[in-house]
Regions:
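Bacterial N-terminal signal peptides
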Residues: 6-17
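Periplasmic-binding protein-like
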Residues: 123, 137-140, 166-175, 196-200, 205-207, 277-300, ...
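A bilobed periplasmic-binding-protein/Venus flytrap-type ligand-binding module shared by bacterial periplasmic
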Residues: 141-148, 184-186, 254-266, 285-286
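Extracellular/periplasmic bilobal clamshell ligand-binding domains
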Residues: 302-337
Length: 337
């Protein structure tokens, strides 16, 4: 009986100690931002979605303002490099693809930060050297306008886009480098090379940004596009005639990650923002805009987005080492006038 009592006392003490430690971590995170008053967030996350995150964050921490700069991953990377070279430091928090973040890490543009909430994430979702943590997954899929494409004609796999009937009638992002490089990694140079050469001959339309692609697909500007499924699900809820294929093999998947800028002028506020996005509350906001949260306790809002049901191929962790090569190849193939 005494042993049992001693064990209960020990367990209770450990539990209370863990709770006290967590509270101390949170208290220390809050103290600094109250002095800094703002955080600057450079992100690729679409305007509506980042606004939802900021609204939740500022409701919880009303003493802080968040300024958001949204652009493509490549443009954000170049902007941070340009600012750093000029000795100007504006960004506190960066959230881009793991490929872009790998490039920025290699250039010394990040500082290591291990958020308390990152403990809830699997090892594969966290940088080994603690420079960044994953916040959501982005799947590259084929989307189509159901009012323009008969059910029997709907493309299901990537090679379906080589059918002559789709010539000039499908669209993709003008910076689709991750998708391009991952298919090369998965299929091998020979198979992928033949596919992309044939795909370029199909004269796809190029647009800037997947949000725009999804909106134009819904508007009927083209019948088929390579899109992110969470944006298709958002449009479906608003009544748009769009759908996406769940059976493509592979479904290339990019991880969007969040990090603290190397010379963050409001580093304490930046840390608090990162910790919030990784928290269950922050990940629930990500879930509610139909994105795919990566905190294990928060499941996707749409069952079809359950990653275990899809033939996922993740963008290789070291792709940033080859990105210049892939960018050039992609542009040479698809940017021809």
């Amino acid at each position: 009986m005494r042993r049992l009592f001693s064990l209960l006392v020990t367990v209770t003490a450990l539990s209370l100690g863990a709770l006290a430690s967590a509270q101390n971590d949170l208290n220390s995170l809050i103290a600094g931002p109250k002095q800094e008053k703002e955080a600057v967030w450079y992100t690729t996350t679409s305007a509506g979605d980042n606004q939802a995150i900021v609204a939740g964050f500022t409701k919880k921490y009303p003493f802080l303002k968040v300024q958001v700069l949204r652009s493509t991953g490549e443009k954000l990377r170049q902007r941070v490099i340009t600012e750093t070279t000029a000795g100007q430091y504006f960004s506190d928090v960066l959230s881009v693809s793991s490929m872009e973040m790998g490039l920025m890490k290699s250039r010394g543009l990040l500082q290591a930060y291990d958020p308390p909430e990152a403990e809830a994430y699997p090892a594969g979702a966290r940088d080994k050297e603690k420079y960044f943590t994953a916040i959501y997954a982005r799947n590259f899929v084929m989307g189509y306008n159901t009012a323009m494409v008969a059910e029997k004609d709907r493309p299901k796999d990537w090679t379906d886009l080589l059918d002559p009937k789709w010539k000039g009638k499908f669209a993709l992002d003008e910076e689709e480098f991750e998708w391009y490089g991952t298919l090369i990694d998965y299929w091998g140079r020979e198979k992928a090379g033949k596919f992309f050469k044939a795909l370029a001959a199909q004269q796809p339309q190029l647009r800037r940004g997947h949000s725009l692609l999804a909106q134009l697909l819904a508007a009927g500007e083209f019948p088929v596009a390579i899109v992110f499924p969470f944006e298709i699900e958002q449009l479906k809820r608003r009544g748009a005639p769009v759908e996406w294929s769940t059976v493509s093999d592979p479904i290339v998947t990019s991880i969007n990650v969040m990090a603290l800028a190397a010379k963050a002028p409001h580093s304490a506020a930046g840390k608090l923002l990162i910790n919030y996005v990784l928290s269950e509350e922050g990940q629930t906001i990500i879930k509610n805009v139909s994105r795919v949260p990566l905190r294990p306790s928060v499941k996707p809002l749409v069952p079809r987005l359950d990653q275990s049901t899809l033939k996922i191929r993740y963008v290789p962790a070291d792709m940033f080492r080859k990105v210049a090569e892939y960018e050039k190849e992609f542009r040479d193939l698809f940017w021809k006038k």
